[in-house]
Amino acid sequence: MAQSKPVKKIVLAYSGGLDTSVILTWLKETYGCEVIAFTADVGQKEELSGLEEKGIKTGASKVYIQDLRLEFARDFIFPAIQGNALYEMRYLLGTSLARPLIAKAMVEVAEKEGADAFAHGATGKGNDQVRFELGVKSLAPEKTIIAPWRIWNFGGRSDLIEYAKSKGIPVSITVEKPYSMDRNLMHISYEGGILEDPYREPDEKMFLLTTSPEKAPDAPEYLELDFQEGNCVAINGKKLNPYEVMEALNTIAGKHGVGRVDIVENRLVGIKSRGVYETPGGTVLFLAHRDLESITIDRDTQHHKDKLSIEFAELIYNGHWFSSRMKAVRAFITETQRYVTGAVKVKLYKGTCSIVGRKSSVSLYNPKMATFEKEELYNQKDAEGFINIYGLPAQETARLRKK
């Protein structure tokens, strides 16, 4: 059953594929209202030409296709890198970062068009339904949200195909891939189908962004990444905007097989899910940025930030991009990045990204203090008093418990 609350105009997150094409027609049929299709270009590399015509033929009153690649890199990927966001210590959150941006853009279209409802094609078992809907609830709490997969009676792909045929929906019926794929500027994710067996190795033909490490170039490639306040602004001296940085690093690091991850992660809804990810550019940025922090942020601030990065990643993964807690966490992260300026030299070789050098005009690393040679600034005799005070709790605990 559909929601009882009447709606007048719906903005649908639309890809032009089987699911959202069926949803478009089903929404019009079920709610008897105008449906506006919205497509975001977040670097998925899909053919977007002809999508507007397809949406209109399927029944959309209007089709919006927005290029959000620069905004995605600048306002979502780069802040995640600044915060060292890594979910469960392994996942760089590519899909999680794109969803709040799409929700934000859909809200803007809804306000422009006077729409009072949103619809999406996320299933009731995944994380994306939460991310989309929390985004809308945070930005447009008065709007209605429609999630067809939680409402209708279609059981799966075969039911959708039959419905599409019966309604004359213009979709190309192809052999279903043995897994699902989601691509954007940050990564490509693969899950489901044959990948549901966590012991089965992925087929090498599956990977689109990265060369097999075994077949990667036999010579390493070195890059110098320039950072300003935690953001990469140049590669090998060439100034680039955030979108260009991601495009360049995806190509270069992908050629060397960098950024493959095969994990089982804990979904927000409580299900464990196997995911295989290609994140070449994001991997290089993550490692280089964290390394630069090691010479530009003091110890106590860095340690606290490292702890907060776990919470930051969970907030992103769980769809809380626009929450008050996220704003507070990001404010702290932004403050820590004031001096994260400098250059990092990385070495790419057969699936690995190694940091081989770093420098900064505001570095806290003092070779005169760190030297193993005759010191000028550090008096080793001072260490004895420090250790006596620092070790006092341990010493007293041991002494008193021996009584």
From Swiss-Prot:
Any one GO biological process: argininosuccinate metabolic process
Location in or out of the cell: Cytoplasm
GO molecular function: argininosuccinate synthase activity; ATP binding
EC number(s) from the headed UniProt entry: 6.3.4.5
Reactions the enzyme catalyzes: L-citrulline + L-aspartate + ATP = 2-(N(omega)-L-arginino)succinate + AMP + diphosphate + H(+)
Positions with a binding annotation for L-aspartate: T123, N127, D128
Enzyme class, UniProt record, top EC level: ligase
InterPro entries: Arginosuc_syn_C, Arginosuc_syn_N, Arginosuc_synth, Arginosuc_synth_CS, Arginosuc_synth_type_1_subfam, AS_cat/multimer_dom_body, Rossmann-like_a/b/a_fold
Keywords, comma-separated and alphabetical: Amino-acid biosynthesis, Arginine biosynthesis, ATP-binding, Cytoplasm, Ligase, Nucleotide-binding
Pathway: Amino-acid biosynthesis; L-arginine biosynthesis; L-arginine from L-ornithine and carbamoyl phosphate: step 2/3
Binding site residues for ATP: A13, Y14, S15, G16, G17, L18, D19, T20, S21, A40, G121
UniProt xrefs under Pfam families: Arginosuc_syn_C (PF20979), Arginosuc_synth (PF00764)
Top-level division of the source organism's lineage: Bacteria
Similarity comment: family membership: Belongs to the argininosuccinate synthase family. Type 1 subfamily.
UniProt subunit comment: Homotetramer.
Designated name of the protein: Argininosuccinate synthase
Encoding gene per record: argG
